[in-house]
């Protein structure tokens, strides 16, 4: 599954974590 930590890790240093979390389909 897709987890917050995973999404944040994917975009770390690229864009804000908030952006990643909102763009993670598996997350609300």
Curated annotation (Swiss-Prot):
GO cellular component terms, semicolon-separated: extracellular region
Disulfide topology: 2-24, 7-20, 11-26
Expression by tissue: Expressed by the venom gland.
GO molecular function, one term: toxin activity
Subcellular location: Secreted
Keywords attached to this entry: Disulfide bond, Ion channel impairing toxin, Neurotoxin, Potassium channel impairing toxin, Secreted, Toxin
Biological role stated in the UniProt entry: Blocks potassium channels Shaker-IR (with inactivation domain removed) and hKv1.2/KCNA2.
Record-stated family: Belongs to the short scorpion toxin superfamily. Potassium channel inhibitor family. Alpha-KTx 20 subfamily.
Comment text on domains: Has the structural arrangement of two alpha-helices stabilized by disulfide bonds (CSalpha/alpha 3(S-S)).
Protein name as annotated: Kappa-buthitoxin-Tt2b
Organism: Tityus trivittatus (Argentinean scorpion)
